[in-house]
Each structure stands twice: as structure tokens, then as C-alpha cells.
Regions:
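N-terminal small/glycine-rich loop or linker at the start of catalytic domains
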Residues: 116-141
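Active-site beta->alpha loop and helix N-cap motifs at the rims of alpha/beta catalytic domains
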Residues: 114, 118, 139-156, 170-174
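Catalytic core of soluble alpha/beta enzymes
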Residues: 164, 170-304, 308, 328-332
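Flexible C-terminal active-site loop/helix
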Residues: 4-6, 11-15, 294-361
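Metal- or metallocofactor-binding catalytic centers and their adjacent structured scaffolds
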Residues: 37-39, 43-115
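Active-site mouth loops of central-metabolism enzymes
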Residues: 132-146, 166-167, 192, 196
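Structured beta-strand/loop patches that form or line metal/cofactor-binding pockets in enzymes
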Residues: 1-56, 330-333
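Residues at the N-termini of beta-strands
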Residues: 5, 161, 214, 261, ...
Length: 361
């Protein structure tokens, strides 16, 4: 395969509803879309969701990364071996711009798979997808009326696992948690780095109705010792999201391994291959895994996350995303790749998953 063109552009798709949490609020996608074209006329598509508060990237900086490396990639990447070699040579640059590399990697993998007539899983040396994937209901930090409307839809659809974005305001958050407790569903909280220190976090968290399954990122990213203290005080696992964007971040985490759950999102990890590597490192260390999603992902990133979830095996405790046109005014493929009844995405219901490359755009 020879790459003849690599192009990057912003992807702007309106949301069907506004989504908010402690770090941001948005009403449309903020994504990078990369298209590669081979000399044989085969195209590949890639997507990522650069976020300043996750990896320090923006759509503009990610597009600039593509521009800086376009010519070298076209000249040197022709197959899986050369793609892996390029990534190894540029590891430090990718560490600093993982979302930018994610969109590039996915587009190249898509083109490689389409050229060879094989699926993403075959390219990665992974088993074919099978069975079903179970997704979580994710509820943003809206007012109580907005929460009630969202939860009513999720509950009617049969969801039994919920991730709730919290505000840090007990009057705002406690009624939501009470409603979820009454429903008997499993609940985890996402604080999006809300509190400045463990004492402030615990003052709020110890006043909440219990139990909760897990707590995501209550403090500044990378505050592992303080996070371990919060986990011990609450007897609740901590979900690492912004604190874990590559394998190195999992080394020497303090305390018992079951105190940590790693949220693996393809975009922030730097693509599907790096995401699988993080999953394998987490499993080897005894940590559990959530395969997460950035708000506003299209079906392409949903597709890319499936082999990552499959690689997690019994360590997988939850999945996020696959909202398709429930959140997006339109998706990149029709029908979109999204969960169905009960939050399940059944592989057999989506024949395009067996198509060459990513098979969705």
C-alpha cells in the first residue's frame, strides 16, 4: 500500500441535547476527522476527540500534528510493520498528542484493512468479534428535570448500569442518587477532577447516599497517593481516566490492585493499538477495565473500541458510548453502530463489523 494523500478536518455534528460535566459543556462534537487515500484509490477514515482537559490537545493542535507528519507517513508507512515502526520512532511525540495520532492510526488501519480485504481484528491479530457488548447509561450534570427525563428514557430501555456526572453540590446531586438507588441499579460517579484535595472531596462524598460502585477522577489528574487515600476511606474503587493515558501511568499504583479501574478510551490512549496495550497492562497488574468514550464519538470510534473491550476479557466491568443518533443529529454511517434494547450491542445485528477495515465509514 502507498499513501498518496492524508487530510485532516474538524468534524462538527450538532447534539440532540446539551451535555455537561464539571470540566466542560457542549452541544456539538469537537472532533478531528482524518481521511487517507492510497495510490490505488482506497480510502481510510479515522476519528478522534481532542480535549484540552484530557490530553492537552485541541482540534487545531491535532490537525497541526497531521500536517507536520503527513509527508513522512506517506513516504514510510506501507503496511502494519512500517506503521508499528513509525509509531515506535515517534513515541514521545505521540505521548504528547495521542488524540492526533489516534485519528491518523485509525485511518491508516482502515485503509490497510480495505486494501487487504481483512477486518480490524485480523490486522491486530485478535479474534473475530462475537456475542454482545453491554453499555452504561451516562447522565450529565443537568438540573433535576433534565436528569429525570434522561433517566426515564434509560430506565424504559432496560439499562441497569449508570454513570452519573456530579456537580459537588449535595442539593443538586443527592436527589438524583436517591432516584437511582430506588431503581436498584449499579451506579458509579464521575467528578471530572472536581476537588482541589482529598479533604474537600471526602467532605462531599461521605455525605452521599451509599453504596456506589466506583468513583471516577475526583482530584487532579495523576494525584495517585491522594486518590488511594480517598479509595481507602470510602472503600470504593477509583476509576482512572485523565490520570491514565498510556501504559507508563499504570506502573506502581499504590495500594491493592482492585482499588483501581482503568478507563480506556481509544482517543485519549493514542489509537486502538495503544488502547489494547493499556488493557493488557491493566489485566497483568490485576486492575479492572472500563472501555470508555468521549462525548460525541461517532460510529467510527464506537467500532474501534470493540476489539479493545474484547481484549479486556473478564477484567471488563463496563462500557461507555455507542450513542449514535441518540446523541448525534447524524452519524457517519447509516444505520449507525449503536446500542439497542437494554444497552446491548449485538455483533450479529451489525454485519458491517465483518467488513474490511473498520467497515463503518
Amino acid at each position: 500500500m502507498r499513501l498518496s494523500a492524508l487530510d485532516a478536518r474538524p468534524l462538527l455534528i450538532p447534539f440532540t441535547t446539551r451535555f455537561a460535566h464539571a470540566s466542560a459543556a457542549r452541544s456539538e462534537t469537537a472532533s478531528l476527522w482524518v481521511t487517507v487515500t492510497t495510490s490505488e484509490g482506497v480510502t481510510g477514515q479515522g476519528e478522534s476527540c481532542p480535549r484540552p482537559y484530557v490530553t492537552g490537545e485541541s482540534v487545531e493542535s491535532a490537525a497541526a500534528f497531521v500536517g507536520r507528519h503527513r509527508d513522512e507517513l506517506a513516504a514510510t508507512v506501507h503496511d502494519m510493520a512500517s506503521l508499528e515502526a513509525w509509531e515506535a520512532r515517534h513515541a514521545a511525540a505521540i505521548d504528547a498528542a495521542p488524540a492526533a495520532w489516534c485519528a491518523l492510526e485509525l485511518a491508516i488501519l482502515d485503509a490497510l484493512g480495505r486494501t487487504a480485504g481483512v477486518t480490524l481484528e485480523t490486522l491486530l491479530g485478535l479474534p473475530p468479534l462475537a456475542g454482545a457488548f453491554q453499555y452504561t447509561a451516562v447522565i450529565g450534570d443537568g438540573d433535576l428535570a433534565h436528569f429525570e427525563a434522561q433517566w426515564a428514557r434509560y430506565r424504559a430501555a432496560g439499562f441497569r448500569d449508570v454513570k452519573l456526572k456530579v456537580s459537588g453540590d449535595l442539593e443538586r446531586d443527592v436527589p438524583k442518587l436517591a432516584a437511582l438507588a430506588d431503581a436498584g441499579v449499579r451506579v458509579r460517579l464521575d467528578a471530572n477532577n472536581l476537588w482541589p484535595n482529598a479533604e474537600a472531596a471526602l467532605a462531599y462524598l461521605t455525605a452521599l447516599p451509599r453504596p456506589i460502585f466506583a468513583l471516577e477522577e475526583p482530584l487532579a489528574p495523576g494525584a495517585f497517593a491522594a486518590l488511594a487515600g480517598v479509595a481507602a476511606r470510602l472503600d470504593t474503587p477509583i476509576v482512572l481516566d485523565e490520570s491514565a493515558t498510556r501504559v507508563a501511568h499504570l506502573r506502581d499504583l499504590p495500594g491493592p490492585p482492585d482499588r483501581w479501574i482503568v478507563n480506556v478510551r481509544v482517543s485519549k490512549m493514542g489509537g486502538v493499538r495503544r488502547a489494547v496495550a493499556v488493557v493488557r497492562a491493566a489485566r497483568a497488574a490485576g486492575h479492572r477495565v472500563i472501555v470508555g468514550a468521549q462525548v460525541g464519538e461517532t460510529s467510527l470510534l464506537t467500532r474501534a473500541a470493540l476489539p479493545v473491550a474484547a481484549a479486556a476479557g473478564p477484567a471488563l466491568v463496563a462500557m461507555e458510548g455507542a450513542f449514535g443518533t441518540l446523541l448525534l443529529a447524524r452519524d457517519v454511517c447509516d444505520p449507525p453502530l449503536m446500542f439497542g434494547a437494554g444497552g446491548r450491542l449485538v455483533v450479529a445485528d451489525h454485519p458491517r463489523l465483518a467488513s474490511p477495515g473498520l467497515g463503518v465509514a
